[in-house]
Amino acid sequence: MDFILGGVAACGACFFTNPLEVVKTRMQLQGELKSRGTYQVYYRNVFHAFYTIGKIDGLAGLQKGLVPGLVYQFFMNGVRLGSYALTESLGYIHTDGRVSATKSTVSGAIAGVVGAVMGSPIYLVKTHLQSQSTSSIAVGHQYKHRGMTNALFAIHKQHGILGLWRGASAAIPRVSVGSAAQLATFSASKEMVNDLQVFSEGSWLIALSAGMISSVVVVLAMTPFDVVSTRLYNQPVDHLGKGMLYRGFVDCFSKTLKKEGMTGLYKGLGASYFRLGPHTILSLLFWNELRCLHQSYS
């Protein structure tokens, strides 16, 4: 049941934050491997990106990739949050009745790796669909998929089953780092807020406060990995399915750092927080409340 609750909670958050994911993806691909001032800026900031996409691609453009986004969140976070909840219920993340920073971080990272591997094909398709736009504001390589199913069949037909896991080398560090940061800080923050007795015991405000603290840590830790992941998933490939811009995670990381500097790895930081912040807060809040609701009826 923990796996289903985790998936449902993440889907609830995804429905509200998907437009922010579209904006984040576009901003991370803008000026790829180009020095500042040498490329046309279509999206000046988060708000300008919202306006531009809404104006040129239409309001539906802001919800591009929603279907694969929901599928990805259900399976990836279902496995990730469900695995973590299982280790938590077995008492593994606690030492002497208190949350262990080391154990909760390791548990979060392992849960993230499992979720990332399972969800990688859907994340690949989601990235392709969210980067697709009208030519006048296009950034990154433009695939011409007609939808999630069409994309999965097209990739499988051209590059085989392994082609669906292209980019997984970036997804694993991305999700493991993000998961470790998110779940460890959420567990510790929830315990801290409880100790301060700011809210009544069992209040949903405890989970909300812990989620807000966790969201800041997640964005700072995850953004460089998120930029690399987006670029690896979206890069054009040759007839053998090999990337034409990057050989893998380390190559993409080093090329981005060399060409665009440290700011390149934090491209779209504002968009990342606007997306990952609310998503982290909402998914953790929904997850916590659904678990409490399930426990009260079981």
Curated annotation (Swiss-Prot):
Taxon lineage:
Eukaryota, Metazoa, Chordata, Craniata, Vertebrata
What's the gene? slc25a35
Ordered alphabetically, the record's keywords are: Membrane, Mitochondrion, Mitochondrion inner membrane, Repeat, Transmembrane, Transmembrane helix, Transport
Task: Give the family, as the similarity comment puts it.
Answer: Belongs to the mitochondrial carrier (TC 2.A.29) family.
The protein's name: Solute carrier family 25 member 35
The Solcar repeats lie at: 1-90, 99-192, 202-293
The protein's matches in PANTHER family, at most eight in alphabetical order, are given as:
RE38146P, SOLUTE CARRIER FAMILY 25 MEMBER 35
Give the subcellular location: Mitochondrion inner membrane
Please provide one cellular component term from the Gene Ontology annotations of this protein. mitochondrial inner membrane
- Per its UniProt record, what Gene3D superfamilies does this chain match? Mitochondrial carrier domain
Its membrane topology is listed as:
Multi-pass membrane protein
Chief place of localization: mitochondrion
List where the protein spans the membrane: 38-58, 59-79, 91-118, 168-189, 204-224, 276-296
Q: Pfam families attached here?
A: Mito_carr
In terms of superkingdom, the source organism counts as Eukaryota
InterPro entries listed in its UniProt record: Mito_Carrier_Antiporter (IPR051508), Mitochondrial_sb/sol_carrier (IPR018108), Mt_carrier_dom_sf (IPR023395)
